[in-house]
Amino acid sequence: MKSFSNIDFSKLSLIDSIIATSQIIREDFPTKFVISDLYNKVKEAKFYISSEIEPNLKLKKLLKLFYKTWNFGAASGIYKLSDVLWIDNVLKTRQGTAVSLGILFLHIAQELKLPLNPVVFPTQLILRADWINKKKWLINPFNGEMLDQHTLEVWLKGNISPTAELYEHDLYKAESITVIRKMLDILKSALMEEKKMELALNVSNLLLQINPNDPYEIRDRGLIYANLECNHVALTDLIYFVEHCPEDPISEIIKVQIHAIEQKKMILH
């Protein structure tokens, strides 16, 4: 596994950061294919929007190309969540999630010098375009459609809390590292659900290099180790979580798991 510490996110674009982290997680990640396919898509998009002068019209045309002509969009039918997160797979199937589709569209738009940025909204990634006249567009990466304030408020109330309110900071531009962390969080959960524990462990270790002392991430790594029957290191991580988050209701469940692992160790010895 390559060293995560060698990645300088401040010098890499978002897409290059995602490619670099994907290479660390998956030995079979097809970097050459991804770079080549993205290069060709940027080239095609540049030609497709070249007839427009105004940036807002260029962006509208790019949305049409990405979601209608190329037919990128939300996954349908039966699928594994990790399959719609891996960038190489999304490029092949053209089916993704808000975060994977958003990262791809954002890369193409930024290569074409369009004023588009990521926003890590409480419910999903969205894209934000800021225009000279102070107007902004908020775009849903699932389908390329514009989002209004009412829709965002409905999302908050339906997914977070019936009393949740929309605040200005909910729509602030996100730094690349925040988007990467969001994607890795979702990917780790998907891989744990799919019982791909070795890959999930790689993701967890990446997240811990971003935020080394996060007790929740240490807890998740402990749960992954427990699944892999690496009981000694699992105990270290799970005990760390219980000690640092004693008030968290999950701590009681983790204590039961710690006891079960300790009992197993006693039986083995």
Curated annotation (Swiss-Prot):
Coiled coil stretches, renumbered: none
InterPro entries the UniProt entry points to: SirB1_N
A Pfam family this chain is assigned to: Transglut_core2
Source organism superkingdom: Bacteria
Protein family: Belongs to the UPF0162 family.
Protein name stated in the entry: UPF0162 protein BUsg_167
Native source organism of the sequence: Buchnera aphidicola subsp. Schizaphis graminum (strain Sg)
